[in-house]
Amino acid sequence: MPVRVAINGFGRIGRLVFRAIYESGRKDIEVIAINDLADVNTNAHLLKYDSVHGRFPGEVSVAGDVMTVNGHGVKALSVKDPAQLPWKDMNIDIALECSGIFTKRDDAGKHLTAGAKKVLISAPAEGEDLTVVYGVNHGDLKPEHKIVSNASCTTNCLAPVAYVLHEAVGIEKGFMTTIHSYTGDQRTVDTMHKDLARARAAALNMIPTSTGAAKAVGKVLPALKGKLDGTSIRVPTPNVSVIDFKFLTSRNTTIEEINAAIEKAAKGPLKGILATYNVPLVSSDFNHDPHSSTFALHETKVIDGNFVRVISWYDNEWGFSNRMSDTAVAMHKVS
């Protein structure tokens, strides 16, 4: 039986999680309902027409409070308090918490109160039972993990690379910079924001700001806890980002050894999560790419045997959205 999911928050990530499930053609997950404060006609329109990912490759229609997608009816709700959602009556296995609001344990737990069996948060969380980067530590999932975080798009890009290279040559300490496309948390014109850098016009500036993505790797790879840090530079592109990761190794290594370890993982245990390439590509080449991380083999550098620099690309919307359904299915399997 497919895992029955409901999506709370039909914004940027909520819509793309929905779309990724349908575009993948996978039969092990089924969207039963969406909950969003916008009306169903607006949500259907934004699903059908996307400035970054193009038109939805299917049929979308609305009748009353039901959005029908490729012949499958999805109930559209508009409830402010997640505790009041009809998840018990709908027999929801997992609530996909995509609003960006309910990231603390007590808040996300309202979905459990409403009758969902588990909750998967599409963001870094506070007080969660486990943070998962699919492909790296989803094997740690246990039945008692009721509230799970899917980490961030950047952590999903960095963690597979760090995992492979720590196993191969050891990482003593490292620093990541993500050159990140602008997101909805920024402003289109100069106006108020609690982060004064993000208060500036997103499409006109390169904006240095913070990220917890590197430190969060320690949540999924305990051996690297406290060994990584990072920063973010938001740039005037609408989608696709890249990490620039520099680290000291536990022993001397070579460019060839680094690349061989990544290629082996990409063809083996991390196939579909981690990919590689060796030609001069640019950010738009990775738009709508479902991998969490696409490693640039020709960009690997090694200085004095133990200082390594690598880069890896990610579609910060689409890759992460595909991992949401992967993690949801993995959570259901251990129920």
Task: Tell me the role of every PLM-derived stretch.
Residues 1-199, 324-326, 334-335:
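N-terminal Rossmann-like NAD(P) cofactor-binding subdomain of oxidoreductases
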Residues 4-6, 148-149, 243-249, 308-314:
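Short glycine-rich or small-residue beta-strand-to-loop segments that form or flank ligand, phosphate
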Residues 23-86, 170-173, 178-307:
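C-terminal substrate-binding/catalytic lobe of Rossmann-fold NAD(P)-dependent oxidoreductases
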Residues 99-100, 153, 209, 250, ...:
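Structured loop/turn residues at secondary-structure junctions
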Residues 156, 252-253, 318-319:
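A generic structural signal for alpha-helix starts
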Residues 287-335:
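NAD(P)-dependent Rossmann-like dehydrogenase/reductase catalytic/cofactor-binding core
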